[in-house]
UniProtKB/Swiss-Prot annotation:
Function: Catalyzes a mechanistically unusual reaction, the ATP-dependent insertion of CO2 between the N7 and N8 nitrogen atoms of 7,8-diaminopelargonic acid (DAPA, also called 7,8-diammoniononanoate) to form a ureido ring.
Subunit structure: Homodimer.
UniProt-listed Enzyme Commission number(s): 6.3.3.3
Organism of origin: Vesicomyosocius okutanii subsp. Calyptogena okutanii (strain HA)
Gene: bioD
InterPro entries found in the cross-reference section: DTB_synth_BioD, P-loop_NTPase
Pathway of action: Cofactor biosynthesis; biotin biosynthesis; biotin from 7,8-diaminononanoate: step 1/2
Catalyzed reactions per annotation: (7R,8S)-7,8-diammoniononanoate + CO2 + ATP = (4R,5S)-dethiobiotin + ADP + phosphate + 3 H(+)
Name of protein: ATP-dependent dethiobiotin synthetase BioD
Predominant location category: cytoplasm
HAMAP family cross-referenced by the UniProt entry: BioD
Length: 216
């Protein structure tokens, strides 16, 4: 399977936001499908659960699919997917999630939480990445403490022998902390800064990295 897995240092670091940019870039050169195999904290609208992150991914894509295809497992509880599924008596397994990720085109899969967040019964996001065997994009909120968060995520990925496509420092608010320079002293991973005021630099860097991933 060809694709990317979007993970990060935790929740609310901008995974979906960065994923949309990567998807929009990739749609310029190939057909892209998206998958959010499981999503918690879905809104209940007239008895139907609405996965907001999966909807955003779908809008960035150039292939129209049903939201149930994009996000197979939806939970209303604001908790980990593992806890949310168990609360409903559903034994969600790694095989279930792998099956929910399958696509016949290049696929961008967004996980839930960080690499070591539980996502199914005795299953972490890292287990899912291993199973579908695609490069991982690590999204880190670029703030004080980002160096530690980035290195923890990179070390976790390396421990599980995952292929790191890039680490994206998401500057939700532009800053001069210099985290990119600090992180590069401790890793050979590709470090890219997302800054709304310098999108061209971000696009140039991701183009080089993603094109290299595509020809592997």
């Amino acid at each position: 399977m060809k694709g990317l897995f979007i993970s990060g240092s935790g929740t609310n670091v901008g995974k979906t936001f960065i994923a949309q940019y990567l998807i929009k870039f990739l749609t310029n050169i190939l057909k892209v499908r998206v998958r959010k195999p499981v999503e918690s904290d879905c809104k209940n609208k007239n008895g139907k659960l609405i996965p907001k992150d999966a909807l955003l991914l779908s809008k960035a894509c150039n292939i129209i699919e049903s939201i149930d295809k994009i996000c197979r497992y939806k939970f209303q509880a604001c908790s980990s997917a593992q806890i949310a599924s168990q609360a409903l008596g559903l034994k969600l397994t790694l095989d279930d999630l792998v099956d929910a990720c399958i696509a016949d085109e290049f696929v961008v899969v967004e996980g839930a939480g960080g690499l070591l967040s539980p996502i199914a019964t005795k299953t972490l996001n890292s287990d899912l990445v291993q199973a579908i065997n695609v490069p991982v994009v690590l999204v880190i909120k670029d703030e004080l403490g980002a160096v530690n968060q980035a290195l923890l995520s990179i070390n976790a990925a390396q421990h599980y022998k995952l292929n790191i496509s890039m680490v994206v420092l998401n500057q939700i608010y532009p800053n001069l902390l210099g985290n990119e320079k600090e992180i590069t002293q401790y890793t050979n991973a590709n470090i890219v800064v997302f800054n709304q005021n310098d999108l061209k630099s971000f696009e140039r860097q991701i183009e080089k990295i993603l094109l290299a991933d595509l020809i592997k």
